[in-house]
Amino acid sequence: MKKNKELLDNVLKVIAKDRERTNITRKYEQKAIAFLVQCIPLCISSNMLSAIGLVGNLMVGLSFILGAFINSNFLLLGIVGCFINWFGDSLDGRLAYYRSKPRKWYGFCLDIMIDWVGITAIGVGFILYLGSQWKLIGYGFIAMYALEMIITLLRYKITNKYSIDSGLLGPTEVRLVIILVLIIEVIFHGSFLYFSIFATLILLISNIKDGLQLLKFADERDKSN
């Protein structure tokens, strides 16, 4: 038992390189990732896991489309998609570090591109599910998410620190919220509209806060040069 704990702790140290997490579930999530990377067959590469993560996001987008045109029960497919996305997206880079084959810049670029394709697919499903009268909310959601990605990249450029979390909230917490919202929408049809408005407003407020903080960092860096 003690030996297994020491092994898990060592793996945790390896996979935590180059990434500082602040999200609520980080303690349990990192332990789960440390366990899973040891179980991934050698024939599975980090690129394959990235592709699996993308498939998960595409499934979430598809669930909205099927929910809009066939039956809202298809939204439950999005729950499976969230789990698949977490598996691929969380393990791809960490697996590379575990196998001592980190590709920092390649992985960074691939992550950003795949995330953008995935969120666009979800956004398209978002818009179709909400209907034409509320499509501006869907566009707003995509725009706010895109701005969040831009701020993250600029923060990395200015501070040389890359973080995928915004305070206590990270991608995993967002997935959990999406899962909860999908379940509620299946039970109480129409509630998704209110969530969409709320989520877009939260992203707007978060982007304003992070943007102002980013300008402060940029100003401090200019003054230090």
Where are these regions (language model features)?
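Basic, amphipathic juxtamembrane/active-site segments
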Residues: C82-I84, G93-W134
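Hydrophobic alpha-helical transmembrane segments
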Residues: M1-I79, I122-N225
